[in-house]
Amino acid sequence: MLTIFIVTATLFAILYLYFTRNFNYWKDRNVVGPEPTVFFGNIMESVIRRKHLIMIYKDIYEAFPKEKVVGIYRMTTPCLLLRDLDVIKHVMIKDFDLFNDRGVEFSEEGLGLNIFHADGDRWRVLRQCFTPLFTSGKLKNMLNLMSDRGDKFIKMVEKICDKEPEQQIIPLVRKFTMASITTCAFGMELDEEMIETLDKLDSLIFTTSYGNEIDMMYPGILKKLNSSLFSKMIAPFFDNLTKTIIEQRGGKPTNRKDLMDLILELRQKKAIEPMKKTHDEQVTTLELTDSVIAAQTFIFYAAGYETSASTMSFLLFELAENPDIQEKVIAEVDETLKRHNGEITYDTLSEMTYLTQVFHETLRKYPVADILLRNAKADYAVPGTNVTLKKGQTVVVSGFGIHYDPKYYPDPEKFDPERFSPENVRNRHPCAYIPFGAGQRKCLGMRFGQWQVQVCIIKLLSKFRFEPSTKTMSEF
């Protein structure tokens, strides 16, 4: 019995020492931060799914208002949370070459080939390849597709609201974003079977797995094991969908000018390679295989569906809670559409400046890119501090923390579109507003996402006014 006790106690002692072995890392370097918990570090409430990680980082950001950087532990791994905007600008923009990896790469095949999760040379190639697809000139062709989906969406909403005017917004706008994304990406008309399939996939895509925590504790292990963060059902669906669409188009672009057309135009150029930085630099090339294309269409769908729907829901919630702002937006929508004969074009959107301010204020309060991560590619002396990051260490930026900092946004809980007047934007630090990220790894599809939200809001406000119901939550 005594032997069993000693063995058990020894085992627990070894485990305790192992899972706390790094917890003096920041203290030894005179970097302040919250006390870690055994095994979980500073993210225990996220691991047990009691609190979202974005709120944990926001709380840490707010707990150390005088610090430029804060030492934290993602599970047992020491990381640095950046608070100072100038430091963030150095990491995200000025010294980007040392921080161009997100550190979330999980596989070198299948869905892991997507531009969001890719790092290193693969990311550079993908970025150079796909950035031209998301310019205003290319995306203008998709506005007609969005507008057409919007018209069909409004007819559906009218039928629903004729029966019951009180509706939950998020399920409604998800119907629009699903239809918009699938037509703009794949040229698809949704039927009931496809809608049901996508609904099931959405729950799988947006269900958090514990793979993230494992990779936090053992950085890079998912890539080494070639293990996916996503359900095994997701990759075959996008692989089959991509192959089917490419076959239907004979492997060549059509005149639809949707995302698949633009990608097929790229594929006709064969292998893509990035520009060399130096004459002797090795160059990675990328062949646009069906698998590579499927990975990009997956991330385009995943990034554009739920984020746009959430943004629309929050925007409409704020308009319902602030009827004076809603009336101002409606007046601008009506006047602008009248000038453009009811058509939504690039010029139409450009002239709706107040709606654009409302959009940006919505993303300030409810940012899409809640957490920004970057990995140091070499030892790095953090500007304005005595802290040195070691190669491979991760920095964390809390978009929520910054967007709710009264130093940058007085009375941050208030919804105030005037924060994004041209004058206020000019006078604000460039890293004080980062809903889509910052620097060269900023979301490529942000313009598409903005237009998608604006088109839907314009269509809705042309027909409806929004009011809080008795079931509306006053806080999120």
From Swiss-Prot:
Gene Ontology cellular component annotations, sorted alphabetically: endoplasmic reticulum membrane
GO MF terms, alphabetically ordered: heme binding; iron ion binding; oxidoreductase activity, acting on paired donors, with incorporation or reduction of molecular oxygen, reduced flavin or flavoprotein as one donor, and incorporation of one atom of oxygen
Protein name in UniProt: Cytochrome P450 6B5
PANTHER family: CYP9F3-RELATED, CYTOCHROME P450
Organism from which the protein derives: Papilio glaucus
This protein's record includes keyword Cell cycle: no
Membrane topology: Peripheral membrane protein
InterPro entries: Cyt_P450 (IPR001128), Cyt_P450_CS (IPR017972), Cyt_P450_E_grp-I (IPR002401), Cyt_P450_sf (IPR036396), Insect_CytP450_Detox (IPR050476)
PROSITE patterns, sorted: CYTOCHROME_P450 (PS00086)
